[in-house]
UniProtKB/Swiss-Prot annotation:
Pathway: Secondary metabolite biosynthesis; terpenoid biosynthesis. Its cofactor is Fe cation. Dioxygenase; part of the gene cluster that mediates the biosynthesis of fumagillin, a meroterpenoid that has numerous biological activities including irreversible inhibition of human type 2 methionine aminopeptidase (METAP2). The pathway begins with the conversion of farnesyl pyrophosphate (FPP) to beta-trans-bergamotene by the membrane-bound beta-trans-bergamotene synthase af520. Pfam families: PhyH. InterPro entries: Phytyl_CoA_dOase-like. This is Dioxygenase af480. Belongs to the PhyH family. It comes from the Eukaryota. It comes from Aspergillus fumigatus (strain ATCC MYA-4609 / CBS 101355 / FGSC A1100 / Af293) (Neosartorya fumigata). Keywords: Dioxygenase, Iron, Metal-binding, Oxidoreductase. It catalyses: 5-dehydro-6-demethoxyfumagillol + 2-oxoglutarate + O2 = 5-dehydro-6-demethoxy-6-hydroxyfumagillol + succinate + CO2. Fe cation binds at residues 153, 155, 228.
């Protein structure tokens, strides 16, 4: 696994183009002599773009060789999951079995657990959710030729009632193969992270979808309020394999109950960081406000005597 990503900014859409809804914003490998300074500055820019537009793409977080290794491990995870009786076709999500789903990846291989704490991905998720975020789910979707699109949705609209005013979920999409419009790339609606109610979704929403196109090894980080769907794989012989590392705010119940799903023997081997991320610590970090606010607003005075009603 790679560590923190060294990068600079590349915007291929001119700010002077009046038809551009938002920049095609990605980060490319740095050529700066001061890599540490350059990395810090541009990760801040990436976080700012994620906050404003609801997504950001970071290339080459995995090398091509690492992406190929991860893809091989994913097919092994599919076989292991099916051997345990887990269904890899979910009719509630996908129109046909050409869309393969593999759930509960942290249970299947330490490789996936390491991916959850990748510094680049985790820092971007924390930039929206804060330091005490949780892993709500970690799964895979392989769109094989013939796979069709699922329903349009935002991640938060599925689990939370409107209005969606705050970011309470972040999905990190790990591309193990290239992701193109033809092979079923995730489709999204630019600017939809600003929608706060069902009424904000326009009647022509499907016509507004554009693809996230990426190379094997890239990640795409999306705000839980960004409306998106899977694309259809219209190729004859090309799989599109991606992972979804789904992080949530600490006061939200995770989609997966890891304390019940992960064997106790496995839980005991996890690092303190992973135990907290998987909500296996005995402490729940659910405080969002400031516990000292009212004490500061109404400071007690020494010598004051309580008055009974």
């Amino acid at each position: 696994m790679l560590g923190r990503h060294e990068c600079t900014i590349s915007e291929s859409v001119s700010a002077l183009d009046p038809t551009a809804q938002e920049p095609e914003y990605t980060l490319v490998p740095s050529t700066s002599r001061d890599l540490v300074r350059d990395m810090t500055l541009n990760m801040e820019d990436a976080q700012a773009h994620l906050k404003e537009h609801g997504w950001v793409k970071i290339p080459a977080v995995l090398s091509k060789a690492e992406a190929e290794d991860a893809l091989s491990r994913l097919w092994e995870a599919k076989a292991a999951s099916e051997a345990r009786g887990e269904c890899t076709f979910q009719p509630i999500l996908d129109p046909n079995p050409a869309n393969v789903r593999v759930f509960y990846l942290p249970e299947l291989d330490a490789y996936w657990r390491d991916m959850l704490v990748n510094p680049t991905a985790l820092d971007l998720a924390k930039s929206l959710l804060g330091d005490q975020l949780l892993v709500s789910n970690f799964s895979a979707n392989i769109a094989r030729p013939g796979a069709e699109s699922m329903a349009l949705h935002s991640d938060q609209s599925i689990v939370l009632p409107a209005p969606w005013l705050d970011v309470w979920a972040v999905n990190v999409i790990w591309c193990l193969t290239r992701m193109t419009k033809e092979n079923g790339a995730t489709l999204y609606i630019p600017g939809s992270n600003k929608w706060t109610t069902w009424e904000d979704v326009p009647d022509n929403a499907p016509d507004l979808l554009v693809p996230f196109e990426a190379d094997a090894g890239d990640i795409v980080v999306i705000d839980g309020r960004l409306w998106h769907t899977s694309g259809s794989n219209v190729t004859e012989d090309e799989d599109r394999a991606i992972l979804f590392a789904y992080y949530s705010a600490p006061h939200m119940r995770p989609l997966t109950n890891w304390s019940a799903k992960l064997p106790k023997e496995l839980q005991e081997t996890l690092s303190p960081q992973l135990k907290e991320l998987l909500a296996l610590s005995h402490i729940g970090y659910v405080v969002k406000g400031d516990l000292t606010y009212m004490a500061q607003k109404y400071p007690s005075e020494k010598g004051t005597t309580a008055v009974s009603a």
